[in-house]
From Swiss-Prot:
Region Type DYW motif: start-end pairs: 522-616
Keyword NADP: no
Segments for region (Type E motif): 409-484
Any single GO BP term: RNA modification
PPR repeat copies, ranges: 63-93, 94-128, 130-164, 165-199, 200-228, 235-269, 270-300, 301-335, 336-371, 372-402
The species this protein was found in: Arabidopsis thaliana
Database matches in InterPro entries: DYW_dom, E_motif, Pentatricopeptide_rpt, PPR_At4g14850-like_plant, TPR-like_helical_dom_sf
Protein name as it appears in the record: Pentatricopeptide repeat-containing protein At4g15720
């Protein structure tokens, strides 16, 4: 009869090979240990189904220990509905049962179900959670960015006696970080000193900083980790977060340190880490290094191609970006909506208007991507940069967008109006932004500048006073530059640093050499894209422009960085046209390559020209 039962079980061809093993081993040993062992080994649904049948036939359906292993096996196989059905049929589910299903919902991308299970765990037949339960529910809160629920569960944790568990505390740090509550995450992290921190807890805190635009703290904490007397080594997740922080800040030197650790740790073949490195080098202004990383990636994906296309686009290499896109499609890697955004961005920043319009028209038919407001906004930007402002304006009026995307749309049109001296377009775009309550400060400033260009200094000043009364404060312009292991930050007009005298003398000497070559400064360039909109004499305007933060950073770099090395400057705002023209000439005078990353793109100055070709 036993033989008949086994032979009547329907198995996939691969699992039928195991039947003789069951006849000899299982029925000989007659222990549930055999079942549990086989369940832990199972990687096949048919195999687990067979074991499930045997469990029922042999009377283990009411054995919590055995059924838990069945639940865990189904969870591993992504069969969460079957796992949940088994759980619901259990007579006495214990903490392992509950935690397994909660974890399963997390793995299937259903964090809301995981939290519902946790709530049910306390309501039906209260079962005290263990450290793995708490870690799983904090993971669910992280996925949903639910800080309110997370704090309530944190309160339960405090009275559970498990607060000092390193697994739970690490997941708690991660949860607060993903909920944008970095201060609370740091308090939890600091409290772990008393009972130990491991590479997971360090990674969680570094990632919290990196993901919340606090790259400086991420790098400093990474330095502390390296200095700590611990046997732990940075893993690929920590390194990816550090590399991301270096990308956002333009910290090339620390990015290279992280790259060295990636190599020593053997993570270069990890696609996520390699793509992070590619992105870091590109955003730090070292496109050649980014290209080397790209060429080393063995198995390319849409992510690696998209990152490289975006990098080339930001550096003004539109033709190269388009060529790479064609190579990707020829290699049968399907683009996604981000890839096509990158292609349109490349066309916009390189003056490839006809090509960009063609890609837009073919997106749905040829590439299977329906263009949305983000793609149309990119086309508005492209038309505006090329001087086809009226077409850009007409297109902008037809696009249906929400408030946030609308800010990007009208912000692009505002930039086009400023660039091409279209005061009426600047005025219209600014008013729409102010009405939408998005990018209000930049809109006020642009509208004020538009009044100033047309000679309406009183209207301009009145608008700036209104801006102050409404609490909108212009972000202070700053530039920073790396020298060895340090970063030097400069603000416009600020000469309070130790080298201020030397920098000021150097800039005046540069200004003299520029004028000898015909440079006439800001007084010859007063348009809506100029940078000085104050009713002062021309000499004072030139003085104000000469102390812009990017010029101060440039002077420092030329004075202190090794001769012949590339000067890399990061800027938190858009580079002004006056400085852009000056940098082109300076690159020729000093015979140095100068790379400036502003809020929109990279400008690579060399031999008197810029890679943007003035499409910016």
């Amino acid at each position: 009869m036993k033989k008949g039962f086994i032979q009547n079980v329907h198995l996939a061809p691969a699992t039928s090979l195991f039947v003789p093993q069951y006849k000899n081993d299982f029925f000989h040993l007659k222990t549930k240990a055999f079942l549990v062992h086989k369940l832990s080994e199972s990687t096949n649904a048919a195999f687990t189904n067979l074991l499930h049948t045997l469990t029922l036939k042999l009377g283990f359906a009411s054995d919590t220990f055995t059924v838990n292993h069945l639940v865990i096996s189904y969870v591993k196989l992504k069969e969460i509905n079957t796992a949940r059905k088994l759980f619901d049929e259990m007579c006495e589910p214990n903490v392992v049962s509950w935690t397994s299903v909660i974890s399963g919902y997390n793995d299937m991308g259903k964090p809301q179900n995981a939290l519902s299970m946790f709530q049910k765990m306390h309501e039906d037949r209260p079962v005290p959670p263990n450290e793995y339960t708490f870690a799983s529910v904090f993971k669910a809160c992280s996925a949903l960015a639910e800080s309110r629920i997370g704090k309530n569960i944190h309160a339960r944790l405090e009275i559970s006696g498990l607060r000092r568990n390193i697994v739970v505390s690490s997941s708690l740090v991660d949860m607060y970080g993903k909920c944008n509550d970095v201060e609370t995450a740091r308090r939890v992290f600091d409290s772990m000193i008393g009972y130990g921190r491991n590479v997971v807890s360090w990674t969680s805190m570094i990632t919290a900083y990196a993901q919340n635009a606090r790259g400086h703290e991420a790098i400093e904490l990474f330095r502390s980790f390296n200095a700590a007397l611990t046997s732990d080594r940075a893993n690929q997740f920590m390194l990816a977060s550090v590399i991301s922080a270096c990308s956002s800040l333009g910290r090339l030197q620390w990015g290279k340190v992280a790259h060295g650790l990636v190599t020593r740790g053997g993570y270069e073949s990890n696609t996520v880490v390699a793509t992070s490195l590619l992105d870091m080098y590109a955003k730090c202004g070292s496109l050649s290094c980014a290209e080397k990383i790209f060429l080393r990636i063995r198995c390319h994906s849409v992510i690696s191609y998209t990152s490289m296309i975006m990098a080339k686009a930001k550096h003004g290499l539109g033709e190269a970006a388009v060529k790479l896109f064609d190579e990707m499609v020829a290699g049968r890697i399907n683009p996604n909506y981000v890839t096509l955004l990158g292609v349109l961005h490349a066309c916009s920043h390189s003056g490839l208007v006809n090509e960009g319009l063609e890609y837009l028209s073919l997106m749905a038919e040829k590439y299977g991507v329906v263009p949305d407001s983000r793609h149309y906004t990119c086309v508005v930007d492209m038309l505006g940069r090329f001087g086809r402002v009226d077409e850009a304006y007409e297109l902008a009026k037809t696009i249906e967008v929400g408030a946030e995307q609308g800010a990007l749309l009208w912000g692009a049109l505002l930039s086009a109006g400023r660039l091409h001296g279209r005061v009426e377009i600047v005025s219209e775009a600014s008013k729409r932004l102010i009405q939408s309550n998005q990018q209000v400060t930049s809109a006020y400033i642009a509208l004020s500048n538009a009044y100033a260009v047309s000679g309406g200094w009183e209207d301009s000043e009145s608008l700036r006073l209104e801006m102050k009364r409404s609490g909108n404060v212009k972000e202070r312009a700053c530039s920073w530059i790396e020298n060895k292991d340090s970063v030097y930050v400069f603000h416009a007009g600020d000469l309070s640093c130790d080298e201020s005298g030397e920098i000021e003398r150097f800039l005046k000497d540069l200004e003299k050499r520029m004028k000898e070559r015909g440079h006439r400064g800001s007084s010859s360039m007063i348009t809506t894209s100029s940078s000085v909109f104050v009713d002062v004499d021309e000499e004072a305007k030139d003085e104000m422009v000469s102390l812009h933060c990017e010029r101060l950073a440039l002077a420092y770099g030329l004075l202190h960085l090794p001769a012949g090395s590339t000067i890399r400057i990061m800027n938190n705002l858009r580079m002004c046209r006056d400085c852009h023209e000056a940098f082109k000439l300076i690159s020729e005078i000093v015979e140095r390559e100068i790379v400036v990353r502003d809020v929109n793109r990279f400008h690579c100055f060399k031999n008197g020209s810029c890679t943007c070709r003035d499409y910016w």
